[in-house]
Regions:
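Residues at the C-termini of beta-strands that transition into short coil/loop
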Residues: 33, 50-53, 133
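DEDD superfamily 3′-5′ metal-dependent exonuclease/proofreading module
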Residues: 1-30, 37-45, 67-232
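Short, surface-exposed acidic-centric catalytic microdomains
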Residues: 45-65
Length: 232
């Protein structure tokens, strides 16, 4: 059940994936982490998974998150099992009205949705979702420089240990979102209302970025659908 209180005054979960590639329509899950945080910001519970994605992990991806094909095959569980368990954990939060925070949520949730489809699993209904990537763009529209999780954590004084592990990135996402809410009153909304606002904000941000890209490439397209991209 959704709460009418500002989201940062209640419990929240944070979520991150490390995968086989950058294209969310094709990427497979390699690691996944979910962290439940109390209203006071204390870690209450953690879930972590290592999956065998069923395909080779490209060297470029392994260099980012540190999981090789060999390790995933030796230590990981079948990706269908991981996807099912991850989906159930997230769905439980959403059924209870607990917001799930994810940095660049449209990537992670699109990867998860495509994985559920590949394995004939139910896709959880992602609501409410809070995305510090979208939130930061809304309050700092003309900020120059990178908007990676690492760059924004540095800007807002958030400690990011072991970057590009799903557990560290998930918790840093929550800390970043809390820092944004502390600084910007317009982000201190109930989770459901902020979710709905982000749908429009993400679309506007994508349209602006697409306009910029089209100065050099008239055919450039930026998908502003949020929090899950449709199939192409």
């Amino acid at each position: 059940m959704a709460s009418d209180a500002p989201w940062h005054q209640g419990p929240r979960a944070c979520f991150d994936l490390e995968t086989t590639g950058r294209d969310p329509q094709q990427a497979r899950i390699v690691t996944a982490s979910v962290v439940l945080v109390s209203p006071a910001g204390e870690v209450q519970q953690e879930w972590e998974w290592l999956a065998d994605p069923g395909i080779e992990i490209p060297e470029e991806a392994a260099a980012v998150h540190g999981v090789s094909t060999e390790r995933a095959r030796a230590e990981g569980r079948p990706v269908a099992e991981v996807t099912a368990e991850l989906g159930e954990v997230l769905a439980g939060f959403w059924r209870s009205g607990v917001p799930v925070l994810a940095f660049n949520a449209a990537y992670d949730l699109t990867v998860l949705t495509r994985e559920t489809e590949r394995h004939g699993l139910p896709a959880p209904e992602p609501f409410p979702v809070l995305d510090p990537f979208v939130l930061n763009k809304q309050v700092h529209r003309y900020r120059r420089g990178k908007r990676t999780l690492g760059a924004l954590c540095e800007e807002y004084g958030v400690v990011l240990d072991a970057a590009h592990t799903s557990a560290a990135d998930a918790l840093a996402t929550e800390r970043l979102a809390a820092a944004l809410a502390d600084r910007f009153a317009e982000l201190r909304q109930p989770a459901a209302a902020l979710h709905e606002a982000q749908i429009g904000w993400a679309a506007e941000q994508a349209a602006s970025l697409q306009e910029y890209f089209r100065r050099k490439d008239p055919a450039a397209v930026v998908d502003g659908t949020w929090p899950v991209h449709p199939r192409p």
